[in-house]
Regions:
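Catalytic cores of carbohydrate-active enzymes across secretory and cytosolic contexts
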Residues: 1-369, 384
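Short, solvent-exposed loop/linker segments at the N-terminal edge
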Residues: 397-403
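Hydrophobic residues in beta-strands and at strand termini
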Residues: 286, 453-455
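Short, exposed beta-strand/loop patches in secreted or surface proteins that constitute
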Residues: 398, 441-442
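Beta-strand-rich binding/interaction modules
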Residues: 404-439, 461-468
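Short tyrosine-centred short linear motifs in exposed loops/low-complexity segments
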Residues: 447, 455-462
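A structural signal for beta-strand and strand-to-loop patches characteristic of beta-rich domains
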Residues: 361-397, 434-436, 469
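Aromatic sugar-binding surface patches on proteins
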Residues: 443-451
Length: 469
């Protein structure tokens, strides 16, 4: 029944799951990053009870952003001049990102974009305070907010609790030491919570409250009325893009891709798209890939890792300026970020992946009638699959014969013609602490199958036989 397609049993009773309905009726399914695909396979493995998590048919195509939409016009012109016409035609091609040619002119544009960001923040902060009825002194302070020359870290996205906007305040004394240090650092926060997300709205209020409580309004600004224009100003002008989700809650995220396009460096937890983009030279990874059982322990560990990065890597690298007026080490990291993020996390690459992995239209049209007939026969025969069984034939002592394990199987039950082309007998082997291997057995006689498995590494193995379609 229709309701059965979405049915899921919960401890409190049956519920109708739209996710279950979609996965049971879709021809294809995918996550929007490599990690999201992995998480989704584990989340929905109950819909494929005969498969291991690695085999659940949910793939992934990592999100990408449209280069021309999110790249600042001045940088677009500069990139076109430096990279050449090939880049304009094929920005998703890694070979066209000749980043070595970027130099002082690129840095001057970056300085101008930061200045524009600071001016926009001042104007919005002034209007924000005027609208809230704050006094003349507070309005004058807004007109001088932030430093156009200081390292500027942006954080702009939907305010959900798992995104942990207040992670910076986990150790207030450590944060104050960083902000009151010899090098100026400033943060700009912007975003909205979903209207029905009361916890997210409370999180936003908590962020504003903590900034006021610790007297950091000269170094930290929270802007209201977040919109697409402000999002672009922030991704254009920030030097660093901060992202602190609680792993593995972030499906993909795209704001960091937009910031990287414009020359910012990502400072992010290894979640979503950054888990596959980070290579150790193109930005900064907060913490590692561990997931703690306790959210509190996770927050403490990630906060300490964030403070360490700011103190020992991000801030010193940005201010290690040479005679040319900028840090060559910082510029090298920006080059690597542009080279790796620009082409690989573009909408062009994303669309190409979808076409290659999921678009079957032309093939289906060509073979539509034959497929429909085969599908009809398969559907009619499918109920008989559950009556089939497989009996193993293996040596009693499991002695390896010349380094191989000889495995045989006998099929039990009558196989309908509609299932015969699709039926497979498989040996499933897993090494203790290692990965999974699946080997199809060869039919050597009617209803009898055999294969030989040769371990590639020493160790303890578990194995089993199964029927698959």
């Amino acid at each position: 029944t229709f309701l059965g397609l979405g049915l899921e049993e919960k401890p409190w009773g049956p519920v109708f799951s739209m996710s279950n309905l979609a996965l049971r009726t879709a021809a294809q399914a995918n996550g929007v990053s490599r990690l999201h695909g992995e998480v989704s396979r584990n989340m929905f493995r109950h819909l494929w009870p005969g498969l291991l998590a690695e085999e659940v048919p949910i793939g992934h195509v990592t999100n990408g952003v449209h280069t021309w939409t999110f790249l600042h016009p001045r940088l677009r012109r500069h990139y076109a001049e430096v990279f050449g016409p090939e880049w304009v035609e094929r920005p998703e091609d890694p070979e066209t990102w000749r980043v070595e040619g970027l130099g002082e002119a690129f840095w001057r544009i970056r300085q101008d974009l930061r200045l524009f960001l600071v001016r926009e923040v001042r104007q919005r902060l002034y209007e924000q305070r005027r609208r809230n009825g704050e006094g003349p002194a507070r309005l004058r302070e807004a007109e001088k907010a932030l430093d156009p020359e200081a390292l500027t870290i942006g954080f702009a996205r939907r305010f959900a609790t798992y995104k942990r906007a207040v992670l910076l305040f986990k150790d207030p004394e450590r944060l104050l030491r960083i902000l009151k240090g010899p090098y100026p650092v400033q943060f700009v926060f912007a975003g909205k919570a979903h209207p029905k997300d009361e916890a997210g709205k409370a999180y936003l209020k908590e962020l504003v409250s903590k900034i006021r409580e610790y007297g950091l309004e000269d170094r930290m600004v929270v802007l209201e009325d977040y919109d697409m224009y402000l999002a672009r100003v922030l991704t254009h002008g920030s030097d660093v893009w901060l992202n602190t989700p609680r792993r593995p809650m972030e499906a993909s995220g795209t704001s960091g891709m937009k910031a990287a396009l414009n020359g910012a460096l990502n400072l992010s937890v290894l979640d979503g798209w950054w888990a596959e983009a980070y290579n150790g030279k193109n930005g900064f990874a907060v913490g590692d890939e561990r997931v703690y059982e306790s959210e509190e322990a996770q927050d403490v560990a990630d906060a300490q890792a964030l403070y360490d990065l700011l103190e020992s890597e991000v801030i010193p690298l940005f201010y290690a300026k040479g005679l040319e007026g900028y840090s060559s080490g910082w510029m090298s990291m920006v080059h690597e970020s542009l080279r790796t993020v620009g082409p690989y996390f573009s909408a062009g690459r994303m669309v190409r992946d979808y076409l290659a992995l999921y678009e079957r239209g032309a093939l289906w049209e060509k073979e539509a009638r034959a497929r429909l007939e085969a599908l009809k026969a398969f559907a009619e025969a499918l109920p008989a699959f559950h009556a089939l069984g497989v009996r193993p034939e293996v040596p009693g002592d499991l002695t390896l014969n010349g380094g191989r394990l000889e495995v045989g199987a006998v099929l039990e039950g009558e196989v309908p013609e509609g299932l015969r082309p699709h039926l497979r007998v498989q040996l499933v082997v897993r090494r203790l602490g290692g990965g999974l291997e699946v080997v199809d057995l060869e039919e050597v006689a009617p209803g009898r199958y055999r294969t030989a498995f040769r371990p590639t590494r020493p160790g303890s193995y578990t194995y089993g036989l199964r029927l698959a379609l």
